[in-house]
């Protein structure tokens, strides 16, 4: 008999082990990582001063958000907030061997209604379209409504192709 809990050994043996971890999206919330990656994750957690490995993974995802968006077309952070968030500063760390440098980069958080995406502020302006889309529309309308010559058609098509990329 376990005097601390008031349960005898036979009751302990009959109890079925339950997975105490929740499932998220039908998947177990625990993740498997290769043995070669685990020490790196543990070391990074310690060096960044986080209490859990989950905080480190969250930090990694936040800092990789622009690259994830570029690869998938959407971000990874979900939110219930329907408003566009104001500009924020997110910490960014550069890890190079044994040295970590801490920088703060301004970021813009954009909410698309069901997902929140984080972009560095520089990417919001550096990659903005340099062409007025009404000009492209006007070129298209004049070209394909029969109001343009053959040379105008070639010029408008070339302009459209180069400015919409």
UniProtKB/Swiss-Prot annotation:
Residues 17-71 form the TCP domain. Residues 12-21 have a biased composition (Basic residues). One of its GO terms (cellular component) is nucleus. Residues 148-165 have a biased composition (Low complexity). GO terms for molecular function: DNA-binding transcription factor activity; transcription cis-regulatory region binding. Residues 1-11 have a biased composition (Polar residues). It holds the Pfam family TCP. It comes from the Eukaryota. Disulfide bonds: none annotated. It is found in: Nucleus. Mostly in anther in young buds. The keyword Nucleus applies. Keywords: Developmental protein, DNA-binding, Nucleus, Transcription, Transcription regulation. Residues 1-21, 146-165 are annotated as: Disordered. Required during early processes in pollen development. This is Transcription factor TCP16. The lineage of its organism: Eukaryota, Viridiplantae, Streptophyta, Embryophyta, Tracheophyta. The gene is TCP16.
